[in-house]
C-alpha cells in the first residue's frame, strides 16, 4: 500500500501513471547485437500427422519455408532464416554504426508479439489456400474453412555474443533436424517395438534392411538438414514508358541446407551470411569462425568431462565448490580446475593408502 502511494505521488495525471505501469517491466535487446528469433509451432504434432503425408509433406514444408521468407521480409535487419519441422529461426542484427537500432528498437514485448502474430497469420493463410485448393462449390469451401485447424506459433528472442555463436546455433538446430528426420522416417514405417532402444543411426539401418528405404538417398537435403532462407537478386524484364527495361530485385528464397557438421558446409553458410550486406568486420571472431567452432566443440567436450569432478570437489573440498562455480566462466577457471584435480588426486591416494592399512 505504501509503495502504491509513493508511485502515485510521482505523477500529476492518470495518463502518466498508467504509462509507467505499462512500461516498468519493459525489456530491450542491446544495441548493435546479434539476435536470434525463434518461432515454434504450438501443438503442431497431432495436426500435422492427421493432415499431411508422413514422414515429409511438400505442402507443409513449402508453407513453413514461405512463412520464414515472409517473416524475413518484414523484420528489419533480418540476415537469414532456417527452417526445420515446425520451427523457424531468424538471425537479425544491425551492427553497421553505433547509432543503429534493432527492429522495434529491440523492445522484446513488441518484437515477440509482432513476429509471432505475423508467423501465425501468414501460415494459416497458406494452410487455408491449401484447404480450398481445387474446391469451387461455395458450401464446400465454407465447410473446408470451418473444419481447418488453427495453427499458432510462440516466439522467443535472445542476443548472442558473436558470429561464432550464431553459426553454433544453426549447427545445433541442423543437427537436431537430422536426428528428427531419421526418427520420422523410421517411425513412419517401423513399429515402436522394432525401434525401442535403438539409436537413430541404428533405426535408419533397420529401415533400409526391413523396408528397403535408404534414408541417405531416399530424402532430399531439405528433409534431412532443413532449409536456409536468404535474400538474393532476381533478374527481371519489364516495360516502362513503352520501353523494355531490365532490373534486379531482391527476394527471399529457400534453399536446401547442407550437413553443417562438415567444415566446408559451415564455410558455405558463413559466406551466405556475409553476403547479406551487413558489415561483420567489427567481429574478430568472424575472421576464423569455422576453426573457432571446431575449437569450441573440443572445449565443450573438455568442460563436460571436467564437470564430473564437481561431485569429487563437493566430497573432498566442499568449501571450494561455491568458488569453483563462480570462476567457471572466468579466465582462472582452467588453472583452478587443474589445481583442484591435482589436490583431489593426492587426497584420493592418501585415502586409498589409509584403506589398505
Model feature map: region roles:
Residues 1-357:
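Regulatory and interdomain segments flanking nucleotide-handling catalytic cores
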Amino acid at each position: 500500500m505504501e509503495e502504491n502511494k509513493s508511485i502515485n505521488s510521482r505523477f500529476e495525471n492518470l495518463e502518466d501513471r498508467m504509462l509507467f505501469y505499462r512500461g516498468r517491466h519493459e525489456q530491450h535487446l542491446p544495441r548493435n547485437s546479434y539476435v536470434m528469433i525463434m518461432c515454434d509451432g504450438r501443438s503442431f504434432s497431432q495436426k500435422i500427422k492427421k493432415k499431411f503425408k508422413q514422414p515429409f509433406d511438400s505442402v507443409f514444408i513449402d508453407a513453413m519455408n514461405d512463412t520464414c521468407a515472409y517473416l524475413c521480409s518484414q523484420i528489419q535487419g533480418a540476415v537469414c532464416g532456417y527452417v526445420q519441422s515446425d520451427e523457424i529461426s531468424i538471425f537479425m542484427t544491425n551492427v553497421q554504426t553505433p547509432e543503429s537500432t534493432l527492429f522495434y528498437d529491440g523492445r522484446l514485448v513488441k518484437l515477440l508479439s509482432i513476429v509471432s502474430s505475423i508467423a501465425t497469420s501468414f501460415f494459416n493463410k497458406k494452410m487455408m489456400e491449401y484447404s480450398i485448393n481445387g474446391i469451387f462449390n461455395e458450401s464446400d469451401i465454407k465447410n473446408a474453412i470451418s473444419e481447418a485447424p488453427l495453427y499458432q506459433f510462440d516466439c522467443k528472442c535472445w542476443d548472442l555474443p558473436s558470429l561464432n555463436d550464431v553459426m553454433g546455433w544453426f549447427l545445433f538446430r541442423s543437427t537436431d533436424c537430422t536426428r528428427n528426420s531419421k526418427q520420422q522416417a523410421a517411425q513412419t514405417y517401423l513399429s515402436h517395438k522394432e525401434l525401442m532402444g535403438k539409436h537413430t543411426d541404428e533405426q535408419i539401418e533397420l529401415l533400409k534392411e526391413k523396408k528397403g528405404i535408404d534414408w541417405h538417398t531416399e530424402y532430399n537435403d531439405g528433409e534431412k538438414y532443413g532449409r536456409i532462407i536468404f535474400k538474393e537478386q532476381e533478374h527481371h524484364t519489364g516495360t516502362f514508358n513503352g520501353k523494355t527495361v531490365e532490373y534486379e530485385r531482391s527476394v527471399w528464397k529457400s534453399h536446401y541446407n547442407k550437413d553443417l557438421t562438415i567444415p566446408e558446409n559451415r564455410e558455405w553458410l558463413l559466406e551466405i551470411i556475409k553476403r547479406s550486406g551487413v558489415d561483420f568486420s567489427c567481429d574478430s571472431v568472424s575472421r576464423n569462425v569455422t576453426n573457432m567452432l571446431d575449437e569450441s566443440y573440443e572445449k565443450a567436450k573438455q568442460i563436460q568431462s571436467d564437470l564430473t569432478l564437481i561431485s569429487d570437489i563437493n566430497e573432498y573440498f566442499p568449501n571450494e565448490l561455491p568458488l569453483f562455480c563462480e570462476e567457471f566462466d572466468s579466465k582462472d577457471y582452467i588453472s583452478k580446475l587443474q589445481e583442484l584435480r591435482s589436490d583431489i588426486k593426492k587426497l584420493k591416494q592418501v585415502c586409498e593408502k589409509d584403506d589398505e592399512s
